[in-house]
Amino acid sequence: YGSCTVNAYVPLAKYIHETFDILDSDVNVVHNVAKHKLENTLIRKFCTLEKSATNLLPFLNKDNFIVNYTVVPYTGVSIIDFRFRLTKATSLENFLSKFEDAITDGVLKGLYGMDEVDIGPEVHNCTTFSTNFIKENIKIIGNNLYMQGYFDTENSVNRYVDLVNFAVTRHQ
């Protein structure tokens, strides 16, 4: 369990690194604002992911990981874009096959969802997924993997519930 951006990035980056070996990565976040804070204007600010990811994932450091985080006066679902530079290129078909297996029946099951096409952000309001990816927008150019998704920033409580349920099973 972590912040909404930590929940969106860390399990995904761990999986991609273990499967395809990450050289460097950057994340672009356009983050919503809670309704009671809407009077604030567009701001760039620090994101929990900037510090947490490099502490949680030993293959990342300040020299190979960047987060661009912008808060916008909007109460809907947030947008997150990932870029991973891989040690060696893989085909889009190979990546999608492995990734779809991982989110359907594998190590990422229950954490991530994927839509074939972009059906807009608001359908992902109150989702239980840390990120909902858009399959048609997943691209590989050279050894760079690009992924776009939506996440409900106010709903990272789902990962807390997962953590509590996990802890309960460990103490029974």
Q: Over which residues does each language-model region extend?
A:
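N-terminal Rossmann-like NAD(P) cofactor-binding subdomain of oxidoreductases
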Residues: Y1-H36, F151-T153, L163-H171
